[in-house]
Amino acid sequence: MKNKGLGRGLSSLLGEEVISTEKESLEIVQIINIDRIKPNENQPRKHFEYDKIKELSDSILNNGLLQPIIIDNSFQIIAGERRWRACKLAKISEIPVIIKNLDAKESMEIALIENIQRSDLTVMEEARGFKYLVENFNYTAEKLAERLGKSRSHIANLLRLNNLPQSIQNKLDENTLSMGHARCLINHEHAEIIANYVIDNDLNVRQTEELVRQWSQNEYTKYPDNNRIGKQLFKEKTEDNDLQSLVKILSEKFNIKVTIENYSLGGKLIFHYKDLKELDKILLELS
């Protein structure tokens, strides 16, 4: 049966421009087996919180699935993956869908646009979605901004996040690092070292900007052992068995305490002497 409200509902969901560019379809709600439906592998959302899916699942059990899932001719989801997951969790075998008459490329583009417009994506999921649209659908930052109703600077800033090391992208996905922090680290040679320090010391964005500024002036890299931050940034956290063996050999040879401080950009070999006489003895041995 044709639902008179579906045209307006889909327009609200996907936008007037999307509707006008789609091929004609009857927009008939059909009931199909849930196992025939496939998630969209290119959708930007990669993290689905179980608690929120469970909450939606309970709501669907109590009230039914009020909004049909939108799929294409291959039964791949265009819009509604959270609802589909919630229905599977609720062990619902058949669900209402609207099948859109789209080819694979059109389906993928609309699915990406629809998901990117959601407010609960992480900034990194949004950034990856922008990148995919730019690389596969010839979007520019200007065109994306116009299509999504976002500022060009927002689009450009998020696209740049894709240049970050994967470990920092993961921190953005986990919300352990904010977009403001991450922007300070783009294209920085030691971004991962700084990111770990920022998280360990709970620095705000302004403090992170100052840290990066001082770094650029070689305040930490030139003399890392002369300040607390430099030491924490550059000192290796892992024990090196070869270095420990060397410490033992040198200590036994000179009969004094010897330590080695190993940094990512170098290190120090330290002889601990009691008095000048012992220092003279060390220097004589070294010569």
UniProtKB/Swiss-Prot annotation:
Organism: Rickettsia bellii (strain RML369-C)
Molecular functions per Gene Ontology: DNA binding
Organism lineage: Bacteria, Pseudomonadati, Pseudomonadota, Alphaproteobacteria, Rickettsiales
Biological process per Gene Ontology, one example term: chromosome segregation
GO cellular component: chromosome
Transmembrane segments: none
Top-level taxonomic group: Bacteria
Xref: InterPro entries: Chromosome_partition/occlusion, HTH_ParB/Spo0J, ParB/RepB/Spo0J, ParB/Sulfiredoxin_dom, ParB/Sulfiredoxin_sf, ParB_dimer_C
The protein, known as: Probable chromosome-partitioning protein ParB
Role: Involved in chromosome partition. Localize to both poles of the predivisional cell following completion of DNA replication. Binds to the DNA origin of replication.
SMART domains per the UniProt record, alphabetical: ParB
